[in-house]
Curated annotation (Swiss-Prot):
Keyword Chloroplast: no
Organism: Azotobacter vinelandii
The Histidine kinase domain, residue ranges: 302-517
Keywords recorded for this protein, A-Z: ATP-binding, FAD, Flavoprotein, Kinase, Nitrogen fixation, Nucleotide-binding, Phosphoprotein, Repeat, Transcription, Transcription regulation, Transferase, Two-component regulatory system
Organismal lineage: Bacteria, Pseudomonadati, Pseudomonadota, Gammaproteobacteria, Pseudomonadales
Gene giving rise to this polypeptide: nifL
Biological processes per GO annotation: nitrogen fixation; phosphorelay signal transduction system; regulation of DNA-templated transcription
Protein name per UniProt: Nitrogen fixation regulatory protein
Length: 519
């Protein structure tokens, strides 16, 4: 509004023929029908003009507001500081914008988003104040509702025990909750969310790729991490795609979607640990039975091994005597006694062989070597504590599956750990440390079991794998079948086992097994 139109009225004026004389009327009608409430006041805030939107929002008619002060709209709850800021800006001949709590004629309240600007004459003096405001009560309510919902959602997400993370197409972390950050500190060395995302992608493999490429959700995908000296972690992972419309202006009429990935990770370690404890109790009974059967097999095989020699000697002597006696062999009492002894010996060998407990055939299945090692360490805890042995276990964080028999591989590890404990239990061994590690090397799963015992002499590193050969004193139990059994099991899994001759501070047994191509 300019001083060119000092007389303000709500009455329409008749248009003139000349276009220059139409402009003030057009301008007045424009202000009158503007969708925003407009009022013009004198320097004391007395209302000189109010347009239709002003009357609609406030509920006052023209005759009720003209000449009245703008304070008739005040509810008295707006802080005085706001008004001081308003008049301070106007005194500087600068516009002011802010929000006031106004009151309508019917006493209802509304939020007025107000802009007040000084109207200056040609001399730069303020002659009027122009006020424009709109009712933003509904918008404010919606904004507050959205903000409150955001705060509630954030509170729920932040308090949730499940770890949550939102990723963009480049796998960058867009949003994560405190549980995810704590999980990152527990699982990855640098404790960063990005490193944990990379680890999850690697372990989830196919489900993550399907989610990323096709948007197909997955649920209840379990992964586990062995952390060496700490308890293992079992995680149940869920993933889904979130489709969000592009926010940029140039796609307003042709909106496009951006795909984000939401991962939710539940820590089920406590549940799995309880299940694992129950399983270990059953496993103890099973392995005790297997050890009993293995002891029986060892005893029978040792007896057969010992008896086979004399029987073979009798048979050889009998054949020599038969050739020497020729035709008189049939009546020779010594030869007859030898035949009876040979027959009795062969029958005894057959009976012993038939009495050996038969090993049950195992079906091949994917086996996690880290899990078997942890089970064996748990089963041997009492022995390790009794001998004062410190265990240092360094498992690979992600180890491929090994196809084969779970029970036989567990038995193989148990034999090696038992041998290490036996070796370090000698009185002259003061430093008692058992080091176990797993890693992937040359497309093989490599397991090293190292003890600080007296070690194996270089000239015996091959002989120790022979059946019934033992470096233990005669009075010690277990006469030389541990490593041969280990070698047999490893060979059945197309692997290799050997003694590391370069290691001089004890004994290091190295087992290498091929892993499944599908992992």
């Amino acid at each position: 509004m300019t001083p060119a139109n000092p007389t303000l009225s709500n009455e329409p004026q008749a248009p003139h023929a000349e276009s220059d004389e139409l402009l003030p009327e057009i301008f007045r009608q424009t202000v009158e029908h503007a969708p925003i409430a407009i009022s013009i006041t004198d320097l004391k805030a007395n209302i000189l003009y109010a347009n239709r939107a002003f009357r609609t929002i406030t509920g006052y008619g023209s005759e009720e507001v003209l000449g009245k002060n703008e304070s008739i709209l005040s509810n008295g709850t707006t802080p005085r500081l706001v008004y001081q800021a308003l008049w301070g800006r106007l005194a500087q001949k600068k516009p002011w914008s802010g929000v006031l709590v106004n009151r309508r004629k019917d006493k209802t309240l509304y939020l007025a988003e107000l802009t007040v600007a000084p109207v200056l004459n040609e001399a730069g003096e303020t002659i009027y104040y122009l006020g424009m405001h709109r009712d933003t009560s509904e918008l404010h309510e919606l904004e507050q509702r959205v903000n409150n919902q955001r705060l509630m959602i954030e509170a729920v997400v932040n308090a949730a025990p499940a770890a949550m993370v939102v990723l963009d197409r480049q796998h960058r972390v867009m949003l994560s909750n405190p549980s995810f950050c704590r999980l990152a500190r527990d699982l990855v060395e640098d404790g960063s969310s990005e490193s944990l995302v990379a680890l999850l992608r690697e372990n989830l493999a196919a489900p993550f790729e399907t989610l990323e490429n096709q948007g197909s959700a997955f649920s209840g995908k379990e992964i586990s991490f062995d952390l060496g000296g700490r308890s293992p972690r079992w995680l149940s992972c869920h993933g889904r795609a979130i489709h969000i419309e592009n926010e940029q202006a140039h796609v307003f009429f042709a909106p496009t979607e951006e795909r984000y990935l939401l991962l939710t990770i539940n820590d089920i370690s406590e549940l799995r640990q309880k299940q694992q404890d129950s399983r270990l109790n059953a496993l103890k009974a099973l392995m005790a039975e297997e050890e009993l059967l293995e002891g029986m097999r060892e005893t029978f095989n040792a007896a057969i091994h010992r008896l086979q020699g004399p029987v073979n000697l009798i048979s050889a002597a009998m054949r020599m005597l038969e050739r020497r006696l020729g035709d008189k062999a049939g009546n020779d009492p010594v030869l007859s006694a030898m035949r009876e002894a040979s027959t009795a010996g062969m029958e005894a060998l057959e009976n012993l062989s038939g009495s050996i407990p038969v090993r049950m055939a195992e079906s091949k299945m994917p086996v996690n070597l880290n899990q078997l090692i942890r089970e064996v360490i748990t089963l041997c805890t009492d022995q390790l504590l009794a001998q004062g042995i410190v265990v240092d276990w360094q498992p690979a964080l992600r180890l491929p599956w090994v196809m084969g028999g779970e029970s036989s591989q567990r038995s193989m590890i148990k034999h090696l750990v038992d041998n290490a404990i036996e070796s370090m239990s000698q009185n002259q061994v003061s430093r008692r440390e058992l080091f176990i590690s797993t890693r992937v090397e040359n497309h093989l799963v490599r397991m090293e079991i190292t003890d600080s015992g007296p070690g194996i002499p270089p000239d015996l590193v091959l002989k120790v794998f022979e059946p019934f050969f033992s470096t233990k004193p005669p009075h010690r139990v277990g006469r030389g079948m541990g490593l041969p059994v280990v070698q047999e099991i490893v060979a059945k899994h197309a692997g290799m086992v050997h003694v590391d001759t370069d290691y001089r501070e004890g004994c290091r047994i190295v087992v290498e097994l091929p892993f499944s191509a599908s992992t």
